[in-house]
Amino acid sequence: MSVTQRWVRGEISNFQYLMHLNTLAGRSYNDLSQYPVFPWILSDYDSEELDLTNPNTFRDLSKPMGAQTPARLEQFLKRFREWDDPSGETPPYMYGTHYSSAMIVVSYLVRVEPFTQQFLKLQGGHFDLADRMFHSVKDAWLSASRNNMADVKELVPEFFYLPNFLLNSNHFELGVKQSGLRLGDVILPPWAKGDAREFVRLHRQALESDYVSAHLNQWIDLIFGYRQQGQAAVDAFNLFHHLFYEANVNFEAIEDPLTKNATIGFINNFGQIPSQLFKKPHPVKRSLKSTLPLQHSISSNAACAVAQQGVEGPTAAGPLFYHVARI
């Protein structure tokens, strides 16, 4: 039985399945430019209590981040329709930035090593302007889903198992925003009660919820499946700059060293689409209530245990894995 069939039957968790797909698609904890990518799953970062029975709590998993609001999508479509490259080298696209890149990864994880040093390396030895640093989960969501035309980023796996990355335990001087706010720990939504462990517990519980389980196949179609490229990507408002697609870049055919280096730099800095794993619509997961064994259900105690495992951090043998194998 394939891993996909096991997931459809409810024998493995959504987290486990996403990690499996990322690995098959060439994503690795050891490569910041092709780091594992996970979806934004929630849209409610204001409520005091998180209601996982309300569909409005969740992000629309059938649409990429650039299409979460009609107004912003229209701006991307306008660029796509009106695109005109006299040289003919760059075909029309909707999104000129990517949902996963080295800079996105280290920006999310800047408060924990070794990502702090990697962030400083990419930034020329200093932290970014405080107003551009990751400092609030809600603000990051609004930027990626609504407010910023240059931001369509998704998440990294650590959002679902590692409370440490939300805490400035090392007391880094991250700067002061124009509003006067000094950056420290990441500002959490009210339902997290100011507790990074509680945020991770509820976020992981949301990932394994009935709603996400019933719609995760749609996000898989966008990132790893048939809606990743071609006409299906156009129809799903999921078309990125052509250099983000591995099949569109043939380094052997680029004779000019400057052009080759520029292309390599573009991919390293702005990210790359994962390898395509599925050519047909991904099957839907069956109802958890009827298929998921008790030991795979997410309870408060189990989720807290996940958070406890994540806190241990990296080991010498696996510097970037944070004990994911135990989850």
Segment roles from a protein language model:
Residues 1-303:
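Long, non-catalytic protein-protein interaction scaffolds
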Residues 291-327:
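Charge-patterned, phosphorylation-rich low-complexity C-terminal interaction regions
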